[in-house]
Amino acid sequence: MMQILLLALAVSLACADSIDYSKVPGNWRTIAIAADHVEKIEVNGELRAYFRQVDCTEGCDKISITFYTNTDGVCTEHTVVGARNGENDVYTVDYAGENTFQILCNSDDAFVIGSVNTDQNGQTTKEVAIAAKRNFLTPEQEQKFQKAVQNAGIPLENIRYVIETDTCPD
């Protein structure tokens, strides 16, 4: 929990915007992901998630994310529901271990999400992703994403543009 709060604090410096939760629900595509353990987001990696749908319920006390993973060309659909824990807008969910996540900044057509995954072996992975309502980012969105990645302590060379390999169904 402390790691996601530190990640959120660092990344919030890149995303000075406040979160408008009315803009969270909708159809989204993961454009890019960065992680400190980059193998987790490579092709076939368990944290390489292709977002499709995000919904808010109970005043956004719960966020539902529908996404695909692609292992050896086989797309598998997943839906996870994150429950807000506390006042810091941090959500917890079980997927490939224990996860905490937070929407760090958003607009009408893009959002940046930060997460910390602790897998079954106890390995902790910091991750920052950006999703959009189209298949590309504006230069400003790209800049905010890269700044968030740097502020999370993740090298820019660990960014993977996953939209290029998204062959899963809409």
From Swiss-Prot:
Disulfide bond positions: 56-60, 75-168
Family the UniProt entry places it in: Belongs to the calycin superfamily. Lipocalin family.
Protein name: Lipocalin Cav p 2.0101
PTM comment: Not N-linked glycosylated.
Record-linked Gene3D superfamilies: 2.40.128.20
Keyword field contains Disulfide bond: yes
Organism: Cavia porcellus
One GO location term (cellular component): extracellular space
Location(s), subcellular: Secreted
Tissues and organs where the protein is expressed, per its UniProt entry: Expressed in harderian gland (at protein level). Expressed in hair (at protein level). Expressed in submaxillary gland and harderian gland.
Signal peptide start and end residues: 1-16
Transcription regulation found in the keyword field: no
Keywords: Allergen, Disulfide bond, Secreted, Signal
GO molecular function annotations of the record: odorant binding; small molecule binding
